[in-house]
Regions:
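Non-catalytic, usually N-terminal nucleic-acid engagement modules in DNA/RNA processing proteins
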Residues: 1-69
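Glycine-rich phosphate/ribose-binding loops and adjacent secondary-structure elements
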Residues: 52-55, 61-93
């Protein structure tokens, strides 16, 4: 993900790995992986693509977290929008 700084407009790149590292550096008790938040009304093709991307990001985040667990927990967000089958699959992954 690329953001722009509110201070000077500089581009800031945030990967699943750098997101976890930043939360660890801040001493977060609970780390949340990056995910894509979609609007409520979205077509199935876009929903499935977002679902797959988010789960790839979660795996990368978990790998980074497990390299240096410390006393921090990681929680994943359940995805799938209003598609109950995708939400169930998200819980099982």
């Amino acid at each position: 993900v690329i953001f722009r700084s509110y201070r000077d407009g500089e581009k800031i790149f945030l990967s699943p790995e750098t997101s976890v590292e930043a939360q660890k550096d801040l001493g977060s008790d609970i780390i949340i992986p990056l995910d894509e938040l979609l609007p409520f009304q979205v077509d199935e093709k876009r929903l499935k693509a977002s679902f797959e991307r988010t789960h790839r990001w979660e795996l990368r985040s978990l790998h980074t977290h497990l390299q240096n667990k410390q006393n921090q927990a990681m929680f994943a967000v359940i995805h799938g929008g209003t598609n109950l089958d995708l939400r169930q699959e998200s819980c099982q992954r």
